[in-house]
């Protein structure tokens, strides 16, 4: 399990804008996935959720998942903090800063939720404040 000290340390390592992204996104846990939507409290697709959460920190991301992490914003996983973007082909997620935990809108029929990353080598990490 996760200890409170691990979660607090992850939270403390993130700046206020990253913290705002994470808090904003967490308000949508349980909201249904729906392709090409960004409707708080109603439905999101993966890139709609990341775009909406980052807009609340004053950063505008591209609408499509494949364009949300740019070459300028890409970071090594060791530098990733809570609120950073995670991308795999066709899917964008928000890193929780703890172990391999992410928040995302998973797929049709799914709900916005917290999940564990599997096959970490398939994922790229990005800090939108750098791009």
Predicted regions mapped to residue ranges:
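A conserved glycine-rich beta-strand in the N-terminal activation segment of trypsin-fold
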Residues: 92-93
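Aromatic- and glycine-rich peptidoglycan recognition patches
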Residues: 66-75, 96-131
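Intrinsically disordered, low-complexity
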Residues: 1-32, 99, 120-131
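Catalytic cysteine-centered active-site loop
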Residues: 31-82
């Amino acid at each position: 399990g996760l200890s409170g000290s691990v979660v607090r340390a992850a939270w403390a390592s993130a700046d206020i804008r990253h913290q705002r992204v994470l808090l904003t996104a967490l308000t949508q846990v349980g909201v249904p996935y729906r392709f090409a939507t960004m409707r708080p409290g109603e439905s999101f697709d993966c890139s709609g959720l990341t775009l909406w959460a980052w807009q609340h920190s004053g950063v505008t991301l591209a609408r499509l998942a494949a364009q949300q992490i740019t070459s300028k914003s890409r970071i090594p996983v060791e530098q990733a903090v809570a609120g950073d973007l995670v991308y795999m082909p066709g899917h964008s997620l928000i890193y929780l800063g703890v172990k391999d935990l992410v928040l995302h809108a998973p797929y049709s029929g799914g709900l916005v939720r917290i999940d564990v990353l599997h096959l970490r080598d398939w994922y790229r990490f990005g800090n939108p404040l750098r791009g």
